[in-house]
Amino acid sequence: MLVNHRRAGRFALVALLGGVVMLALVAWPATLPAVQWVDDGWNRAMVSIRFTPFVWLAEAFALLGGIWINWPLRVAAMVILAVRRNWVQLGAFVLAIVTSEALIGPLKALYARPRPPQAILETSSYSFPSGHAIAGAVTAVGLVIVLLPPGSRRWSWEVKAAIFASLMALSRTYLSVHWLSDVVTGALLGVGLALGWPALFQEVRDVRLPRWRARKAAAAEAET
């Protein structure tokens, strides 16, 4: 279990660093044109391969990242953790939700990036980063952590959940409601927060706290 939570922590750190790099690339005037060039090409490609059944599928995927799906699942997960009295996982899950939701609005307002043209769905907020991608990743990965015990099986499903969240985020680009860089950034931040908080809490509970208690006990014994 120790190896798995540290591996998840390293994965979370890489994802968060990737998200920060994307934030910098979009913010920096010297690199934004290159990012936009990739985004424009991706958007044109998505528009060129639109096919009604695929649009329906993309809309279904996009729905999974919305509040009407995300929040009931989150509340159910928190109830399960509370019933099990798993306060460490509950605290980590709540912090992942709070920090991710706290990022979305300010970042969108800061970047004030317009949505792509030819969007299929109506949207009112700015484009960058994708709130659906962040929220979907936090929920998908968080549910795996809630429902499965620590171990190699959970780690495997965490990776699958991260991939699923990424596909769900990419569906937003097929509908032209987000640029590619929007959803890549959102997915990286969401996965990083969803994996990072539980890994940090488990490190403190299983490693740091026992070491601190052992040192405290040794110091007390040395004084007697």
Where are these regions (language model features)?
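Membrane-water interface at transmembrane helix exits
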Residues: 26-27, 43, 104-108, 112, ...
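Transmembrane alpha-helix boundary/anchor motif
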Residues: 24-25, 33, 37, 98, ...
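Membrane-embedded catalytic cores of phosphoryl/pyrophosphoryl-handling enzymes
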Residues: 2-3, 119-224
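N-terminal export and membrane-targeting signals
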Residues: 2-16, 87-92, 152-159
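Membrane-interface loops
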Residues: 37, 72-75, 79-153, 161
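Alpha-helical transmembrane segments of multi-pass membrane proteins, especially transporters
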Residues: 44, 92-97, 157, 186-187
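N-terminal transmembrane-helix/juxtamembrane module of multi-pass inner/ER membrane proteins
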Residues: 1-69, 109-119
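Short helix-capping/hinge motifs at transmembrane helix termini and TM-loop junctions
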Residues: 30-34, 66, 84-85, 111-112, ...
